[in-house]
């Protein structure tokens, strides 16, 4: 009898091969043939699921984004109601850590996601996913900032612009930490990432608290 292949699982195996190639050789090397070799498949097997390299890269970008967003949404669902609760603070740091290359799985995803976002500047077929995923991640960061900084004064007239600025500041910090950790892992260790992130969050709270 012919072997039954789980199509969803096979696609994820192929996406995994794409991410490994991006991490070791760069996105430009992620052709159908290179990905097939990395996945231990015939090129025809990859073509069964993806018509072209562009099709493969677009699918992989969405898959990586969705993995990140799934982890983020799962983590945000576990946040407690009190911004000053130590458990909530720890949960926030855990949630934001999903953006960062703190272990092998997250390092592969972070490397691929940043590479795809950069490539979207000059590859139009990636632009829609770059916009979608950025907006989705920004929405999660916005929820975190609102939870951390806005609960004490939910009706503050000037809170909106301040929260937007804080959210953009946090997004930029996360991008910078991820890039630094990927480029200089011997210096920006997982422990250093966590320490910098915790310091940043505490600094945001102090600045917002001082403004009230």
Model-derived features with residue positions:
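N-terminal intrinsically disordered/low-complexity leader segments
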Residues: 1-9, 20, 155-156, 208-212
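Hydrophobic/aromatic-rich alpha-helical bundle segments in the mid-to-C-terminal region
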Residues: 127-131, 148-212
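Helix-loop "lid/cap" segments that line or gate small-molecule binding pockets
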Residues: 97-104, 111-122, 200
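Generic hydrophobic, amphipathic alpha-helix propensity
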Residues: 10-19, 35, 60-64, 68, ...
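Hydrophobic alpha-helical connector segments
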Residues: 59, 73-109, 167-170
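Helix-turn-helix
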Residues: 13, 17-59
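Amphipathic alpha-helical packing segments from all-alpha helical-bundle domains
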Residues: 69, 105-114, 124-151, 195
């Amino acid at each position: 009898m012919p072997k039954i292949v789980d199509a969803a699982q096979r696609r994820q195996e192929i996406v995994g091969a794409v991410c490994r190639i991006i991490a070791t050789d760069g996105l430009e090397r992620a052709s159908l043939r290179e990905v097939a070799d990395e996945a231990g498949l015939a090129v025809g097997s990859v073509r069964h699921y993806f018509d072209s390299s562009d099709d493969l890269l677009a699918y992989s970008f969405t898959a990586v984004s969705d993995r990140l967003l799934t982890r983020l949404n799962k983590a945000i669902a576990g946040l407690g109601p009190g911004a000053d609760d130590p458990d909530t603070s720890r949960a926030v740091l855990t949630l934001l850590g999903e953006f960062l290359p703190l272990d092998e799985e997250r390092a592969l995803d972070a490397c691929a996601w940043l590479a795809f976002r950069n490539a979207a500047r000059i590859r139009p077929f990636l632009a829609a996913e770059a916009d979608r995923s950025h907006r989705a991640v920004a929405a999660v960061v916005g929820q975190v900032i609102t939870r951390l900084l806005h609960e004490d004064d939910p009706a503050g007239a000037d809170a909106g612009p301040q929260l937007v600025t804080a959210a953009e500041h946090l997004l930029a910090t996360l991008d910078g930490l991820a890039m630094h950790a990927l480029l200089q892992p011997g210096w920006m260790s997982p422990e250093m990432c966590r320490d910098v992130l915790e310091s940043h969050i505490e600094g945001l709270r102090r600045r917002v608290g001082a403004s009230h």
